[in-house]
Amino acid sequence: MRVRFAPSPTGHLHVGGARTAIFNWLFARHHKGTFIVRVEDTDQARSTRQSEDMVLDDLRWLRTLWDEGPDIGGPHAPYRQSERTEIYHRFAAELMKRDVVYRCYCTEEELEQKRKAAEAAGRPPHYDLKCWYNRRNDGAPHAVRFHVPGDGDVTINDLIRGQVTWKKESLGDFIVVRSDGLPTYNFSVVIDDHEMEISHVIRAEEHLTNTHRQVLIYRAMGWQVPEFAHVSLILGPDRSKLSKRHGATSVSQYAEEGFLPEAMFNYLTLLGWSSPDGKELFTREDAVGKFALERVNAAPAVFDHQKLAWLNGQYIHAMSAAELRPLVARFFDAPWIEEGIDVVKTSVHRLTQFADALRFVREFTCAEVDRDFREKLRDELRTGGIPTDEASYKAMVERLKTATGLKGKALFMPLRLAITGSDHGPELVRVIPLLKRASEIDPAVLSPLQRVEQCIR
């Protein structure tokens, strides 16, 4: 089994492209096959080597590493379409010998007039075959057109959508090499997939409308047609095509917003595919073992940012503070960060949220608390000491109950306000020891006692 992911490098990797790459990667790994990255960079105005690097970096971040590609080479190099022009010309010449393509000398102005005339007459805007019937080879600038033979149907058995059929009469002769010498997408993709021995073409639904033309080229060359699987669109919450107005759409944006690659991989795998055991949280190895195109849904998938955030939180909560520290340090760091992570991680769903969740450690503002309560708390912390664990915390609480005559919320709310300056946050049994230890190694942190004393003055 040989599959490929063929991005056009015009910017960072879109989540739709990322999902297609993941499905190809999973299919290859499940079948112990080969996953290839091929760069379709023939759009000279938009494709850049910098954009290619961005796409490859995004794939590396997702850890969907490839076996052959533009950076590592392989037996079917080169893996950039811009470096394969001679190959395309060779096969165009072969098709010319077989009399299935022909030179088209019509200018853009002529073609536009033909289109308008066809539309005015209520006919499909197909090419009128002028250059098919009037062959010449005088060296003038020309495109190369594929001649669609006769009537009949073109049918494929799509592995996701089932049988799909097109009428040949709906096609019209189409260009395979432009007048500037560059191949069209439909021509180059067939040549590349054949030359690279691609067995399964797993790609976005938007390419389905190109498939009948590609099948005709395969047949004209006498080549075996690969299996096709067209993956559905990804929609926004309003069920329109996912776009920037719905929020982040590129993999790199989610990385910058504090999402983990494993969570992103897990979530994108679920967009259109379901595990046979119904699980939504799984390892990469689990997904490889269970992945099958038969379980990919043909219906569009809706991108749910809240579900992605929940899933990301599950991965964060399962990690140790030591594992999270280097990841969190990209966004926020402190000498006490590891202990801080442990205190707040169950309330966090993105790495970027740790900074806000731990802001109370370095930032403190006196909240409105009864002076008598604050003085009793100060005395308790001076004489009983600042709690360092659950046992000493519980002992402090019991003594405060006796000293103040308060219990329940009437005790814990002013205690929280006096220590943190906020009416919500992590459990005090963990916050107070954290503040004590952080104040001993970070001059920007006030200890619990210093906070209470500061607000009595």
Question: Each PLM stretch: what is its role?
Answer:
Residues 368-425:
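C-terminal accessory/binding modules appended to enzymatic or scaffolding proteins
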Residues 1-119, 209-223, 263:
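N-terminal Rossmann-like or analogous alpha/beta NTP/dinucleotide-binding catalytic cores
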Residues 221-227, 231-366, 420-457:
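Catalytic adenosine-cofactor/nucleotide-binding cores of aminoacyl-tRNA synthetases and other
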Residues 94, 102-230, 235-242, 250, ...:
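Active-site cores that bind ATP or allylic diphosphates and position pyrophosphate for catalysis
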Residues 1-5, 251, 285-293, 326-330, ...:
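Short amphipathic alpha-helical segments and their helix-coil junctions
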Residues 4-9, 37-41, 196-201, 249, ...:
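Glycine- and acidic
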Residues 47, 84-87, 256, 300, ...:
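Secondary-structure capping and boundary motifs in well-ordered enzyme cores
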Residues 39-43, 205-206, 235, 308:
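Acidic, glycine-rich active-site loops and adjacent beta-strand->loop/helix elements
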